[in-house]
Regions:
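C-terminal non-catalytic accessory extensions
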Residues: 399-435
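Short glycine-rich phosphate-binding loop at a beta-alpha junction
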Residues: 139-142, 228-232, 317
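ATP-dependent adenylate-handling ligase core
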Residues: 171-228, 233-260, 264-276, 290-303
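Phosphoinositide system proteins, centered on phosphoinositide phosphatases
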Residues: 384-385, 394, 400-403
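Cysteine-centered catalytic environments shared across enzyme families
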Residues: 1-195
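Hydrophobic (often cysteine-bearing) scaffold residues that line and stabilize catalytic clefts
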Residues: 114-122, 209, 213, 305, ...
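Generic recognition of stable, solvent-exposed alpha-helical segments in well-folded globular domains
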Residues: 120, 148, 152, 171-175, ...
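Mid-to-C-terminal catalytic subdomains of enzymes
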Residues: 264-390
Length: 435
């Protein structure tokens, strides 16, 4: 219960990477940065018939002011799961809540101003994290590739003493080892992104319990345990010179695509005492400043004049000694997604043990024939151009199908709620002895 007459303030991070969850029941408000934990603590359950949990969590990509931003989802017995993001929530003794948006308060005049402010903020974060009075001081690690965002973050991180990175090497063209050496990193872990497929720890369940659909990253949890994990998340938006959607409200949605990337790996981060620092999102609520800087006269020498053009990232790296042709030449993806897969196709993207466990759970999961059929019909119709173009690519035909042109809202994979419930059921074992 609220412990003092004045109530309390709930202050979330001022970025998209973390959500605070809350459930009110029997005159109490349960709050946690773990969805599974708050469900266990409050004795609440997900509604297995409800298809939109993952889409509700992903709706943050519409931005803080959109009417499509979902702030709560239904639970069993008339309860609701509340989402608090980028806000200060004033919670009163009667459990009434007054919420206001939390912005960074930053402004950027030019590249030098932006770079220095990022360095200052990273240094302050690192000083706090490594303070000797902490019971467990944090280390620091980054990820690196031959793209734009991850290596430019690593270039900044060197200013605050980061010396450790990991890179995927199964695609030689995206191996960031050479860039890491140039930047002065002394500990470089070279890993294979496909290693997760041999895991027997049911890592996929841990990812699904967070509303995430990509277990590739968390397979390397041993590398970032008890560390700050520096990522280039959303650099593909805020650093892209020609991006058409620059705004200051964290609106990162692209059509109806549900692409949450690393913003929902909280169960894994909590387990490993790790903190994600998505560097491009520091001041990401000043995206218009960053676009103006990217298109400024001073940045023209660092613009390649193409659609894949991120002058801020390029300048950070080239001024650190990385040659132009070594990075940002082609866009690669480091993860996987189940967002458009049928259940059968998921087999090739999961470890054998995890898929068999999920298949067993699916057999016991209740079937809702009519609502399932209606939802699947809508899902495949809205995404029909993607599937038709995929078929054309397999037949070596021209991909000519375009999207609907209508933003109907984000739709999660028809199996998403089942996958989420499976993950939550397994994660409950982690917390059940607490209550």
């Amino acid at each position: 219960k609220i412990p003092n007459p004045g109530g309390v303030n709930l202050i979330t991070p001022n970025h998209l990477q973390e959500t605070v969850f809350a459930i009110e029941t029997d005159g109490k408000l349960y709050v946690s940065n773990s969805m599974t934990f708050v469900l266990v603590a409050s004795g609440s359950k997900l509604i297995k018939k409800y298809k939109a949990y993952v889409a509700d969590m992903g709706s943050i990509l519409y931005g803080l002011k959109s009417d499509k931003l979902v702030k709560q989802s239904p639970l069993c017995n008339g309860r609701t799961l509340q989402y608090f993001r980028c806000c200060i929530a004033e919670i009163y003794r009667d459990l009434q809540i007054k919420e206001k948006t939390r912005y960074s308060g930053l402004e950027f005049s030019d590249f030098s101003d932006y770079k220095q402010k990022l360095i200052d903020i990273l240094e302050a974060i690192n000083n706090n994290a490594t303070d000797k009075t902490r019971k467990m001081p944090y280390g620091m690690i980054g990820t690196i590739s031959r793209g734009y965002d991850a290596p430019s973050v690593c270039a900044l991180a060197r200013y605050v003493g980061c010396s450790e990175v990991f890179t995927f090497v199964d695609n030689a063209d995206d191996d960031g080892t050479e860039i890491a050496n140039i930047l002065g990193y002394t500990t470089i872990h070279r890993v294979n992104s496909k290693e997760y497929k041999s895991n027997e720890r049911l890592l996929e369940a841990e990812a699904f319990a967070s509303g995430e659909t990509d277990p590739v990253f968390i397979n390397f949890e041993d590398l970032y345990r008890n560390k700050l994990l520096l990522l280039g998340e959303r650099g593909d938006s805020v650093y892209e010179r020609l991006h058409s959607n620059a705004n200051n409200d964290f609106d990162f949605h692209v059509g109806n695509q549900l692409s949450q990337a690393s913003q929902t790996i909280f169960e894994n981060m909590l387990k490993n005492n790790s903190i994600v620092i998505a560097v491009p999102l520091i001041g990401g609520d000043r995206w218009t400043d960053l676009k103006r800087i990217s298109n400024s006269e001073d940045m023209k020498p660092f613009s390649i004049g193409e659609h894949y053009d991120r002058p801020i990232s390029r300048r950070l790296l080239e001024e650190a000694g990385v040659k132009r042709e070594m990075f940002g030449q082609r866009k690669y993806g480091g993860g996987i997604s189940y967002s458009l897969d049928t259940f059968g196709r998921m087999r090739s993207k999961m470890s054998v043990k995890s898929f068999e466990a999920l298949k067993g759970y699916r057999k016991m999961f209740p079937k809702f024939l009519w609502s399932d059929l209606c939802y699947k019909t809508k899902f495949y119709w809205v995404n029909r151009s993607i599937y038709l173009n995929y078929i054309c690519s397999k037949l070596h035909l021209k991909q000519a199908f375009k999207g609907t042109g209508n933003d109907v809202g984000m739709l999660a994979n028809p199996n998403a709620t089942m996958m989420l419930c499976w993950g939550v059921e397994l994660m409950k074992e982690r917390y059940k002895d607490k209550y």
